[in-house]
From Swiss-Prot:
<dbReference type="InterPro" id="IPR002365">
    <property type="entry name" value="Terpene_synthase_CS"/>
</dbReference>
<protein>
    <recommendedName>
        <fullName>Lupeol synthase OSC3</fullName>
        <ecNumber>5.4.99.41</ecNumber>
    </recommendedName>
</protein>
<dbReference type="GO" id="GO:0005811">
    <property type="term" value="C:lipid droplet"/>
</dbReference>
<dbReference type="Pfam" id="PF13249">
    <property type="entry name" value="SQHop_cyclase_N"/>
</dbReference>
<feature type="active site" description="Proton donor">
    <location>
        <position position="457"/>
    </location>
</feature>
<dbReference type="Pfam" id="PF13243">
    <property type="entry name" value="SQHop_cyclase_C"/>
</dbReference>
<feature type="repeat" description="PFTB 2">
    <location>
        <begin position="426"/>
        <end position="468"/>
    </location>
</feature>
<comment type="pathway">
    <text>Secondary metabolite biosynthesis; terpenoid biosynthesis.</text>
</comment>
<dbReference type="InterPro" id="IPR032696">
    <property type="entry name" value="SQ_cyclase_C"/>
</dbReference>
<feature type="repeat" description="PFTB 4">
    <location>
        <begin position="563"/>
        <end position="603"/>
    </location>
</feature>
<feature type="repeat" description="PFTB 5">
    <location>
        <begin position="612"/>
        <end position="653"/>
    </location>
</feature>
<comment type="similarity">
    <text>Belongs to the terpene cyclase/mutase family.</text>
</comment>
<feature type="repeat" description="PFTB 6">
    <location>
        <begin position="674"/>
        <end position="715"/>
    </location>
</feature>
<dbReference type="InterPro" id="IPR018333">
    <property type="entry name" value="Squalene_cyclase"/>
</dbReference>
<dbReference type="GO" id="GO:0042300">
    <property type="term" value="F:beta-amyrin synthase activity"/>
</dbReference>
<feature type="repeat" description="PFTB 3">
    <location>
        <begin position="486"/>
        <end position="528"/>
    </location>
</feature>
<feature type="repeat" description="PFTB 1">
    <location>
        <begin position="121"/>
        <end position="162"/>
    </location>
</feature>
Length: 733
C-alpha cells in the first residue's frame, strides 16, 4: 500500500539531492507492496469505494490515506463523546462548546507529523490530474466545468499510460475523445496547451503565438522587461521561450502519430496551423485577447520571427537561448530543483533533458519530482508544491486560540520547531538581482525552506506565530528565535509594501498596470504583474502590529508607516457592498475575514471605522438559514458574491465569517448570529472529531481553485475557540 514518508527518506545515497535544513517538511509517497494489515487495507479500500460512489457530489478528497496511516501509527481513538445541540430551543452551554473544541483539538493534534507540520494535499492546477466530469471532460480544477485544456491533457495522459482510444462507450478515452471532437478538436486548446502539444509532436509550432527567447536579453528599464513580470509568469515563459526558440519536438513515436489522427477533426497534414494561433475554445476562454494584443502577436509571428531565424540575427537567437537556460539553471539551483511550482517544474525539467538527457541537471530534477505527487482516496495527483508552512501557521494560531496550551505543549513545541527550521535565512545565491530575484532572507515560503521562494503572507503568518511563541514559557513551547531573525522577517515584509500601502505576494510591484492587458493566458487573470492583495496586506498588518508592541525600537518609523499605510489600503479597497475580494480563498467571505482581522489590530473598531461596520452588514446579510455561510467558487471569476447552490453552507467559510464578526464586536451587540453558526459547526462535527470535507475553499489567479483539506480541521476549531473565549470573557454564557 502507499505510505507517506517524511524528511530525508531515500536521500542518503543520492548525490543529486540536497537540502538547506535536512529536508524538514519534505513529503514523499512510496508504494510498499508488503505494508498494511488486513484491517488497514480494508479501511483504505472502503475509503476509495466511498469516494468513487460519491465523487460527483463531493469531488474533493478528504485526505483519508494520510489520516488512516498516521492515526493508526499513533493508535488514535477519540475518547471524548460526541455532542449535539437539539433544534427545540436547546442553547449552547460552556460544556458543549468546550467538548466540541477538545474533540477537534484531539484529532487534529494526532494528525501532526514527526517534523511538526500537518501533511496534506494542496491540489492546484488540476488539469494535470483531476476526476473526469459526467460529460466526459476534465476541468481546470476539480469542481470546474470541462475544458479543452483539461480534456486534451488528460486524454493524452491516458493514452501515454497505455489506454486504448476505443474501449467502448463507457471508456474514459472514448468519452474524452468524443468531448474533444464534438467541440471542434484540439486546435481550440489554449496557448499553454498548444505549447505542450508542440513539444510532444502532436501540434505544429507555427500554430503558437511567438515566445521569443530574446525577451531575456531586454534591458531592465523597459516596461516589458522580464524582471518586472509576476514571478510565476516569468518562470513559466522562461522554459517555454526556450522550447519555442529551438522549435523543440520530442521523438515522433507511433503513439504520437496515432494521437495526431485522434484529436483533430481534419487530417493533421491539412491543418493551416498559422491561422489557429488565436483560436481558443469557448469553454476555456476567461481572459479574451484584445485586438491590440493579437496585432502584436501577428507582428512578431509574421515580421520579427522570420528575421530572427535568419543570418546574421540567428546568432542573437543562439545567445538568447543560452540566456534562457542560464536563468533556468539558476532558478533550479536556488530552489533545490523544486522550482517555484508544479507548472514550472516539468517545463524546467524537460528543458534540462532537451539540453542533455544524461546530464546532472536533469538527474537533480528527477530526484525532486516525487515531492509533487500526492495520494488520496481518489488516487494520485500532481499538487502545487505543498502547503506545509502555510497550514502550520494557521494550525498554530487555531491551537493557541483554544487556550489549552498546558495540555498540548508537545504539539506546539514541535510546530514551533518546524517554523523556526523553515525560515529562509539567506538571500538567493550570487548576484540575485541580475536574475530578477528579490531579497528572501527572513521570509517563509508556502511549503518548506528548500523551496526558497518567500511569500509575504506566509512570512507574516509564520512571524506572527513565532512572536506568539516568544510570549509563552519556553519549557512548554521551546526557545524563542534570536531577535535578529524577527528583524529579518520584518525587513522582508517592509521591502514588499507598495506605494498604495498594499502588499503583493512574492515580490514588490515593478511594472505598470497596463501591462496586464497583454496577458496571453486565456484562462487566468492577474498573472502578468504583481498585484496588491488584501489578505497579504492584512496578514502583514497583524504581524507588524504585534512586532511593534514587542520590539518597539527596530525600524520604529518604518514599522509605524507600514501599519498606517496598510490599514489605509485595506479601507480604500473595500467594495461598495462592504466586502473585500479575496485572491487566495473563496472569496468575498475570505477577503472580508482577513480585512476585518487586520483593521482590528490597527485599533479600528465597529464604532470608529465605517469599513468594519459595512463589512459586518455584508456578512450578516449573506448568512444562510441554517446559521452558516456558503460561497460558490464562481464568485472568483465573476468578481461578485454568489451563494453556493441551494443556499447551503460551507463549514470553512462559516468559520471565516464567524471570526470576522467576532473581531468586529458582534458578540457585544447581538450574539444570535454567532450562536446559530456555532451550533452548525458543533452539530456538523463527525464522530471522530473531524469535520466533513465539502467544497473547495482556496483560489488563485482569479479562475482556478485550490484544495486545502486541512482547512476543514483548522478553521472550525479556530472559530469555536474564539467563540468560546469571547463568550467566556463577556460572561454571556
Amino acid at each position: 500500500m502507499w505510505r507517506l514518508k517524511i524528511g530525508d527518506y531515500g536521500t542518503k545515497n543520492d548525490p543529486y539531492i540536497f537540502s538547506t535544513n535536512n529536508f524538514a517538511g519534505r513529503q514523499i509517497w512510496e508504494f510498499d507492496p508488503d505494508a498494511g494489515s488486513v484491517e488497514e487495507l480494508a479501511e483504505v479500500e472502503e475509503a476509495r469505494l466511498n469516494y468513487l460512489k460519491n465523487r460527483f457530489n463531493v469531488k474533493n478528497s478528504s485526505d483519508l490515506l494520510w489520516q488512516i496511516q498516521i492515526l493508526r501509527e499513533k493508535k488514535f481513538k477519540q475518547t471524548i463523546p460526541q455532542v449535539k445541540i437539539g433544534d427545540r430551543g436547546e442553547e449552547i452551554t460552556p460544556e458543549i462548546a468546550t467538548t466540541a473544541l477538545r474533540r477537534a483539538v484531539n484529532i487534529f493534534s494526532a494528525l501532526q507529523s514527526s517534523h511538526g507540520h500537518w501533511p496534506a494535499d494542496n491540489s492546484g492546477p488540476l488539469f494535470f490530474n483531476t476526476p473526469m466530469n459526467e460529460d466526459g471532460g476534465w476541468g481546470l480544477h476539480v469542481e470546474g466545468h470541462s475544458t479543452m485544456f483539461g480534456t486534451v491533457f488528460n486524454y493524452i495522459c491516458m493514452r501515454l499510460l497505455g489506454e486504448g482510444p476505443d474501449g467502448g462507450e463507457n471508456s474514459g478515452c472514448t468519452r474524452a475523445r468524443k468531448w474533444i471532437l464534438d467541440r471542434g478538436g484540439a486546435t481550440g486548446i489554449p496557448s499553454w496547451g498548444k505549447t505542450w502539444l508542440s513539444i510532444l509532436g502532436v501540434y505544429n509550432w507555427s500554430g503558437c503565438n511567438p515566445m521569443p527567447p530574446e525577451f531575456w536579453k531586454l534591458p531592465y528599464f523597459l516596461p516589458i522587461s522580464p524582471g518586472k513580470l509576476l514571478c510565476y509568469c516569468r518562470l513559466t515563459y522562461m522554459p517555454m521561450s526556450y522550447f519555442y526558440g529551438k522549435r523543440f519536438v520530442g521523438p515522433i513515436t507511433p503513439l504520437v502519430l496515432q494521437l495526431r489522427e485522434e484529436i483533430y477533426i481534419q487530417p493533421y497534414d491539412e491543418i493551416n496551423w498559422s491561422k489557429l494561433r488565436h483560436l481558443c475554445a469557448k469553454e476555456d476562454l476567461f481572459f479574451p485577447h484584445t485586438t491590440v494584443q493579437n496585432l502584436l502577436w501577428d507582428a512578431l509571428h509574421n515580421l520579427v520571427e522570420p528575421v530572427l531565424n535568419r543570418w546574421p540575427l540567428n546568432k542573437l537567437r543562439e545567445k538568447s537561448l543560452e540566456a534562457a537556460m542560464t536563468h533556468i539553471h539558476y532558478e533550479d539551483e536556488a530552489s533545490r530543483y523544486m522550482t517555484i511550482g508544479c507548472v514550472e517544474k516539468p517545463l524546467n525539467m524537460l528543458s534540462c533533458w532537451a539540453e542533455d538527457p544524461n546530464g546532472d541537471y536533469f538527474k537533480k530534477h528527477l530526484a525532486r519530482i516525487g515531492e509533487y505527487f500526492w495520494m488520496g482516496e481518489d488516487g494520485m495527483r500532481v499538487q502545487s508544491f505543498g502547503s506545509q508552512t502555510w497550514d502550520c501557521a494557521f494550525a498554530v494560531q487555531a491551537l493557541l486560540a483554544c487556550n489549552l496550551t498546558d495540555e498540548i505543549g508537545p504539539i506546539l513545541m514541535k510546530a514551533h520547531d518546524f517554523l523556526k527550521t523553515s525560515q529562509v535565512t539567506d538571500n538567493p545565491p550570487g548576484d540575485f538581482e541580475s536574475m530578477f530575484r528579490h531579497t528572501s532572507k527572513g521570509g517563509w515560503t508556502f511549503s518548506n525552506k528548500d523551496h526558497g521562494w518567500p511569500v509575504s503572507d506566509c512570512t507574516a503568518e509564520a512571524l506572527l506565530c513565532c512572536l506568539y511563541f516568544s510570549m509563552l514559557p519556553p519549557e512548554i513551547v521551546g526557545e524563542k528565535m534570536e531577535p535578529e531573525r524577527y528583524y529579518d522577517a520584518v525587513n522582508c515584509i517592509i521591502s514588499m509594501q507598495s506605494q498604495t500601502g498594499g502588499v503583493p505576494a512574492w515580490e514588490p510591484r515593478r511594472a505598470p498596470s497596463w501591462l496586464e492587458s497583454l496577458n496571453p493566458i486565456e484562462f487566468f487573470d492577474e498573472v502578468i504583474i504583481e498585484h496588491d492583495k488584501v489578505e497579504c496586506t492584512a496578514s502583514a498588518l497583524k504581524a507588524m502590529t504585534l512586532f511593534k508592541k514587542l520590539y518597539p525600537k527596530h525600524k520604529a518609523k518604518d514599522v509605524e508607516n507600514f501599519i498606517r499605510n496598510a490599514a489605509k489600503f485595506i479601507e480604500d479597497t473595500q467594495k461598495l457592498d462592504g466586502s473585500w475580494y479575496g485572491g487566495w480563498g473563496i472569496c468575498f467571505t475570505y477577503g472580508t475575514w482577513f480585512a476585518i482581522s487586520g483593521l482590528v489590530t490597527a485599533k479600528k473598531t465597529y464604532s470608529n471605522c465605517l469599513a468594519i461596520r459595512k463589512a459586518t452588514d455584508f456578512l450578516l446579510k449573506i448568512q444562510c438559514e441554517d446559521g452558516g455561510w456558503g460561497e460558490s467558487y464562481r464568485s472568483c471569476p465573476n468578481k461578485k458574491y454568489i451563494h453556493l447552490e441551494g443556499n447551503r453552507s460551507n463549514l470553512v467559510q462559516t468559520s471565516w465569517a464567524m471570526m470576522g464578526l467576532i473581531h468586529a464586536g458582534q458578540m457585544e451587540r447581538d450574539p444570535t448570529p454567532l450562536h446559530r453558526a456555532s451550533k452548525l459547526l458543533i452539530n456538523s462535527q463527525l464522530e471522530d472529531g473531524d469535520f466533513p470535507q465539502q467544497e473547495l475553499t482556496g483560489a488563485f489567479m482569479g479562475n482556478c481553485m485550490l484544495h486545502y483539506p486541512t482547512y476543514r480541521n483548522i478553521f472550525p476549531m479556530w472559530a469555536l475557540a474564539e467563540y468560546r473565549s469571547k463568550f467566556q470573557s463577556s460572561k454571556i454564557f
